[in-house]
């Protein structure tokens, strides 16, 4: 069984999280510039078995795709072209992940300076996306 990899995609940078090979625990992996995302993922997948990629889907409070989709959709198209044909890429609701990441850091006692680290928040948001997906029936397919 291979790992799951989650991406919290942003215009400037992307938070990335992965599971362990048994898909029990999700951990933060890295924050990479958006322009280097595909290279990073290809390199990681050359070293580790990844069976599925989960990408945060930014939605509005009403559940509609947000304006951010206008830059995420082309990036996903480029990513899919670089992956093997039919490789599973799942879009997953990411509402409130940045807020939840900030709250988790606060609860963990991270000082204010650490909570203002946008890269750390992006990584934590990717972990939250991945944990949400792992908790869903869809991830068990």
Question: Which residues does each PLM region occupy?
Answer:
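Phosphate- and other anionic-substrate recognition elements at nucleic-acid/protein interfaces
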Residues: 2-7, 11-12, 17-141
């Amino acid at each position: 069984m291979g790992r799951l990899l989650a991406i919290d995609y942003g215009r400037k940078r992307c938070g990335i999280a992965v599971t362990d090979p048994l898909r029990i625990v999700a951990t933060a992996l890295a924050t990479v510039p958006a322009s280097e995302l595909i290279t990073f993922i290809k390199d990681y997948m050359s070293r580790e078995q990844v069976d599925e990629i989960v990408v945060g889907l930014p939605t509005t409070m009403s559940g509609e795709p947000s304006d951010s989709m206008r830059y995420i959709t082309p990036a996903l198209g480029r990513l899919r072209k670089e992956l093997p044909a039919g490789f599973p890429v799942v879009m997953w609701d990411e509402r409130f992940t940045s807020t939840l990441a900030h709250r988790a850091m606060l609860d963990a006692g991270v000082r204010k300076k650490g909570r203002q680290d946008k890269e750390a928040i992006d990584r934590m948001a990717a972990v939250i996306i991945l944990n949400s997906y792992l908790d869903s029936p869809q991830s068990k397919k």
